[in-house]
């Protein structure tokens, strides 16, 4: 389904979770997924609809799962994980009438997620286990996991944490989040040889053991108003260091998320808003 071949009009829903916005397509009827060109076209904020990512809802792939979904970044590249997107998929399914239960399963490209409705336009999603082993993030040049990695970045020494939440994340702790060099360091880290699949880069400031501020420079999208998997990544890295507790609020430019990781070796839970902005028709 490309720009030239897509059948117009194309119905869609615009959704957002803490300002991280999505164009959601219902492809449960077997319609082919969008190609790179169409995703980039839909995501364009001037000539298309405009979003950080495009989500396609597809038929379930497993037993007990209500729906599956795929995610693409604004540049058309595929994404493996998106916590805000998962909540928006859940909200879309509830609004559509596809699910009536307070607890249900949805399939992302990397795993099934248990979702709970916890209030009006509020959802909690199990994000799975954080992965700290370098080869599984992937992070090259470091045989063993550690709390902090030291990288050379154009003559600078940069210290960061690294973790996979189904997608790779680097976490840089800063003193003042408002003046952090998010775009410069973020783009350099995404091109660094240590991250062969590129990386989402989070810049985090600890306010107190239960509260942090975060900005995220995402693969294929640049800085976004919020990043759910990035919030989880920053929180678990800080938890591993003993910098915050096991239940932390993460304040991003677009809103506040809650990350809970009760025990190491257990799943991480991400909670926050997910709302429909509008339904629309795209005419190409």
Curated annotation (Swiss-Prot):
The active site is at 82 (proton donor), 227 (proton acceptor). The keyword Isomerase applies. The record marks 278 as: Important for dimerization. GO terms for cellular component: cytosol. Pathway: Amino-acid biosynthesis; L-lysine biosynthesis via DAP pathway; DL-2,6-diaminopimelate from LL-2,6-diaminopimelate: step 1/1. The keyword Cytoplasm applies. Belongs to the diaminopimelate epimerase family. It comes from Xylella fastidiosa (strain 9a5c). The gene is dapF. Catalyzes the stereoinversion of LL-2,6-diaminopimelate (L,L-DAP) to meso-diaminopimelate (meso-DAP), a precursor of L-lysine and an essential component of the bacterial peptidoglycan. This is Diaminopimelate epimerase.
């Amino acid at each position: 389904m490309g720009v030239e071949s897509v059948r117009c009009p194309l119905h869609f829903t615009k959704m957002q979770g803490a300002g991280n916005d999505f164009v959601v397509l219902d492809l449960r009827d077997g319609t082919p997924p969008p190609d790179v060109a169409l995703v980039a076209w839909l995501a364009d904020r001037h000539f298309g609809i405009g979003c950080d990512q495009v989500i396609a809802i597809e038929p379930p792939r497993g037993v007990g799962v209500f729906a599956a979904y795929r995610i693409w970044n604004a540049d058309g590249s595929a994404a493996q994980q998106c916590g805000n997107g998962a909540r928006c998929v859940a909200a879309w399914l509830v609004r559509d009438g596809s699910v009536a239960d307070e607890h249900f399963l949805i399939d992302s490209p990397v795993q099934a997620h248990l979702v709970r409705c916890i209030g009006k336009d509020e959802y909690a999603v199990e994000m799975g286990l954080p992965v700290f082993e370098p080869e599984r993030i992937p992070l090259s040049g470091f045989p063993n996991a550690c709390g902090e990695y030291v990288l050379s970045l154009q003559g600078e020494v940069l210290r960061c944490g690294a973790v996979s939440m189904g997608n790779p994340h680097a976490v840089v702790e800063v003193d003042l989040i408002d003046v952090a060099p998010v775009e410069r360091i973020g783009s350099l880290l995404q091109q660094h040889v240590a991250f062969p699949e590129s990386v989402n880069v989070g810049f985090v400031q600890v306010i107190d053991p239960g509260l942090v501020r975060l900005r995220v420079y995402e693969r294929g999208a640049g800085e976004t108003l919020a990043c759910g998997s990035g919030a989880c990544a920053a929180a678990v890295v800080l938890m591993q260091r003993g910098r915050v507790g096991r239940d932390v609020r993460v304040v991003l430019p677009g809103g506040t998320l809650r990350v809970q990781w009760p025990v190491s070796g257990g799943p991480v839970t991400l909670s926050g808003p997910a709302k429909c902005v509008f339904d629309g028709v795209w005419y190409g």
